[in-house]
Amino acid sequence: MARASSGNGSEEAWGALRAPQQQLRELCPGVNNQPYLCESGHCCGETGCCTYYYELWWFWLLWTVLILFSCCCAFRHRRAKLRLQQQQRQREINLLAYHGACHGAGPFPTGSLLDLRFLSTFKPPAYEDVVHRPGTPPPPYTVAPGRPLTASSEQTCCSSSSSCPAHFEGTNVEGVSSHQSAPPHQEGEPGAGVTPASTPPSCRYRRLTGDSGIELCPCPASGEGEPVKEVRVSATLPDLEDYSPCALPPESVPQIFPMGLSSSEGDIP
C-alpha cells in the first residue's frame, strides 16, 4: 500500500511538471483551415514556428516607428534651438543700435552706419518727383556777350574736268551787322576778297554747327546742268542757329574770303 501511494505521488508530481510544457504549446492556423501545433516558439506564417522576436514582422514595424519618432523630435529640437539663437542675436543688435543712437548724437556720430539722419542724405529722390520734374536739356551753344564775331571761310571750286584752280588767302571778318561790301576783285589776284554777291549761283554751303555737326544744303538758284561749286563756311552766328545757310538772304551771309595757295604752285589734284 505504501508503494502504491508513493507511486501515485510521483505521477502527480510528474504531471505537475509536464503541465507547463503542455501550456507552452500553441495551436496555429494553417493552410486550408488545417491548424498545426508549435511545440516551442510562436506562430510564424502559415506553416512554421518562430523562436526569436526578430523573426516576427511586427518587431521591425515597432522599431521603424520608434526611429521615425526620434528623428522628428531631434529635428524640432534643433529648429527651436536655432530660433532662440537668432532671437538672442537680434536682441544684441538692437541693444547695440540703441546705445549707438544715444551716445553718438553729435555732429560726427560714432555709429554713422546706424544713424538714419546721416544715411538720409544719400537717399535718392522719389519716383514721382523724378517723373513730374524731368531734367531740362543743356542750353544751346551761344557766343559770349560783348565778344566780336569772327568768321573764317575757305572756298573750294571744282570744275567738271576734276581740276581745281588756285586758292587765295584772305582776311577775317569782324561782324555781320555792319554789312560792309568789299569791292569785287578778280580771282587771279592774291589777297582779294569775294563777296556773296560774286559767289557763283551754282554752289552749296557747308556750315559747322556747335555740336560738331555739318549741314550741307545746295543753293536754291543752282541749276542741274551747271557744275556744282562748294563753299565751306565755319561761323558762329546767332542768326545762323535757327536757319539753314541756304535759306538766308544774301545780305545776312558773312563775307567769304578764299584761302589757299597761290596760282603759281599749280593745280591740286
UniProtKB/Swiss-Prot annotation:
Keyword Repeat recorded: yes
Compositionally biased region (Polar residues): 174-183
Motif extent (PPxY motif 2): 137-141
Tissue: Expressed in most tissues but at significantly lower levels in placenta, lung, liver, and kidney.
Transmembrane is among the record's keywords: no
One Pfam family, short name: WBP-1
Superkingdom of the source species: Eukaryota
Residue span of motif PPxY motif 1: 124-127
Alphabetical keyword list: Repeat
Molecular function (Gene Ontology), one example: WW domain binding
Region (Disordered) location: 169-203, 249-269
Subunit (UniProt): Interacts with NEDD4. Binds to the WW domain of YAP1, WWP1 and WWP2. Interacts with WWOX.
Domain free text: The PPxY motif 2 mediates interaction with WWOX. Both PPxY motifs mediate interaction with NEDD4.
Name this polypeptide is given: WW domain-binding protein 1
Naturally occurring in which organism (per UniProt): Homo sapiens
